[in-house]
Amino acid sequence: MILVIGLGNPGKEYQYTRHNIGFIAIEKIANQYNSSFSTKKQFNCEIAETISDGQKIIFIKPTTYMNLSGKSVISVKTYYNINPAKIFVIHDDIDLETCRIKFKTGGGNGGHNGLKSIDGVIGNNYNRIRVGVGRPKNNQDVADYLLNNFLQSEYEIAMQAIDRIVNNFDLILENKLEKFKNKIV
């Protein structure tokens, strides 16, 4: 069993923001497995479940705001008794240019409030799929930048990155993490 978490903020006003790239990605991945989300209030998230090649996959989108994402992660992790090594978090990263993706296990949170929240409840020994959204230009405030919609040209480039994750996601299910890491760059 694996748990895949897409980070973002709830609400239509945030749907296409840079900070919601995790939600955008997880929706496309779940769709690939013909799995749809439903709200589970007891877990503070939207959840979708499927089985692929005998392995259960649980997808979640926290319904809390980003800085409280750990609340839903710990609820689902505890209920399903999931080892942190089987947890994959997809999130935005301003230290990577748009369209760049990096995969890593463990490590720091890079100042990302969603990761800080998750680290606070399960530690940091889980997998991260970091999706680049670039840095703000012209001294724009970081929070303002992340909570604004992608420019159309950026969105198209970001979707190319998401497609690389979706098209290679089976490698995660096969526990070929190094191969996944190399294919998504």
Curated annotation (Swiss-Prot):
Gene Ontology BP annotations: protein quality control for misfolded or incompletely synthesized proteins; rescue of stalled ribosome
Site residues by UniProt (Stabilizes the basic form of H active site to accept a proton): D92
Entry annotation: catalytic residues: H19
Gene Ontology molecular function: any one: peptidyl-tRNA hydrolase activity
Site (Discriminates between blocked and unblocked aminoacyl-tRNA): N9
RNA-binding is among the record's keywords: yes
Keyword RNA-binding: yes
Binding site for tRNA: Y14, Y65, N67, N113
CDD domains named among the record's database cross-references: PTH
Entry EC no(s): 3.1.1.29
PROSITE patterns: PEPT_TRNA_HYDROL_1, PEPT_TRNA_HYDROL_2
Subcellular location: Cytoplasm
Annotated TM spans: none
Catalytic activity: an N-acyl-L-alpha-aminoacyl-tRNA + H2O = an N-acyl-L-amino acid + a tRNA + H(+)
Main location: cytoplasm
NCBIfam families documented for this protein: pth
Family: Belongs to the PTH family.
Entry function: Hydrolyzes ribosome-free peptidyl-tRNAs (with 1 or more amino acids incorporated), which drop off the ribosome during protein synthesis, or as a result of ribosome stalling. Catalyzes the release of premature peptidyl moieties from peptidyl-tRNA molecules trapped in stalled 50S ribosomal subunits, and thus maintains levels of free tRNAs and 50S ribosomes.
Quaternary data: Monomer.
Name of this protein: Peptidyl-tRNA hydrolase
UniProt source species: Rickettsia akari (strain Hartford)
Name of encoding gene: pth
